[in-house]
Amino acid sequence: MCIRDSNTTQASARERIEAILDDNSFVEIGAGVKARATDFNMQEKDTPADGVITGYGVINGSLVYVYSQNPAVLGGSIGEMHAKKITGLYDMAMKMGAPVIGLIDCAGLRLQEATDALNGFGTIYRKMSLCSGLVPQITAVYGSCGGGLAVLSELSDFTFVEEKNGKLFVNSPNALDGNNDTKLDTASAAFQAEAGVSDFTGDEAVSYTHLT
């Protein structure tokens, strides 16, 4: 297990996976997948793994399935193939009866893919609902988890929000008339912990300890 110093910059999507799994145990699935959309010149954009790394490994010898969103690829936004990788991972986890860990750092819906991206949200909700009570579901929020994506935290059994960069919200703080995040940051880890939405908070290193 490799744990990055909390004083350094944020870990990458792959580093987060490596930090929670046993050394050299991660097997990636769907590394060659890219965005399928061609609208708005999307075919000209490089979209490695379509912004989400998926696969399986072990924690203390026990099998887990994990996905980690990559904000360096279209902000980690959810599109058609991005969602299919996540739901495919859930199918495998259900067959094996193994937990699913989601590491969230996402700009939200990929607007260029329109209804295909919206459908992707729905398929993820459905898979998580079907898995509820059958396999443990854990969500860790390291960056933005906003709009429709915020539902994932409520569909999970346990939710972690990183104390500095984690933002969990349906609407931004300024959606409240006269409010802004300097008055009351309703997206912050502290607010969500007090509201009972998240189960624990801390820096990234703390999250790795909880997740393992």
Which stretches of residues belong to each language-model region?
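Glycine-rich, flexible beta-strand/loop modules in the N-terminal catalytic cores of phosphate-handling
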Residues: 69-77
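An N-cap/entry alpha-helix motif that binds or orients negatively charged groups
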Residues: 4-54
